[in-house]
Amino acid sequence: MTQQEMKKIAAQAALQFVKPDTIVGVGSGSTVNCFIDALASMKDQIKGAVAASKASEGRLRAIGIEVFNANEVSELDVYIDGADEITPQGAMIKGGGAALTREKIVSSLAKKFVCIVDGSKQVDVLGTTFPLPVEVIPMARSYVARQLVALGGSPEYREGVVTDNGNVILDVHNFHIIEPLKMEHTINNIAGVVTNGIFAQRYANVTIVGTPEGAKIIE
């Protein structure tokens, strides 16, 4: 079974967490694209969605789902998103698609975060397989990079990428993130950092793993 097929299995299983007459929080990325495609079957049962990226917003509108601005809602019932890495405790690294700040905003509005992944994204310690993305205000790029080196990381400027917010991304290699919540706060306190891709304060309440045997749900 291909990775794409396992993503589709996880995405389809996430529909059970979408309640009728609600506004759904929708993340971004390849697994979320599978979820949006699956959500088309429920488009007449939900009020609409809040999207964490312009790409997801466009995909939702293309299938006829109304998209709301995050400022128009006070709370979401559920937020569905993927991850680049996720631990058994539900802490994640996200931001491979550079939408991490908006993903943090929309996920913070939700009562429940459902993370949909294939098995390759499961790790015991964050930083094992994927660098940590950090969104940075452009004028602070060099300063922030030096601070990340001081923390033990090896930051790499993501060439040619500008976020939906007009900022740049540093991908930090060589982090072995034993205490995700502490590291999330430490990096966010560096002047010029908009946010980083550790999702530990807003962790996943439910993880759905697509496997050849079907969807495995971890709560």
From Swiss-Prot:
Annotated InterPro entries: NagB/RpiA_transferase-like, Ribose5P_isomerase_typA_subgr, Ribose5P_isomerase_type_A
Example of a GO biological process term: pentose-phosphate shunt, non-oxidative branch
Keywords per UniProt: Isomerase
Gene Ontology terms, MF aspect: ribose-5-phosphate isomerase activity
Intrachain disulfide bonds: none
Biological role: Catalyzes the reversible conversion of ribose-5-phosphate to ribulose 5-phosphate.
Family named by the database record: Belongs to the ribose 5-phosphate isomerase family.
Name of this protein: Ribose-5-phosphate isomerase A
Organism: Actinobacillus pleuropneumoniae serotype 3 (strain JL03)
Name of the encoding gene: rpiA
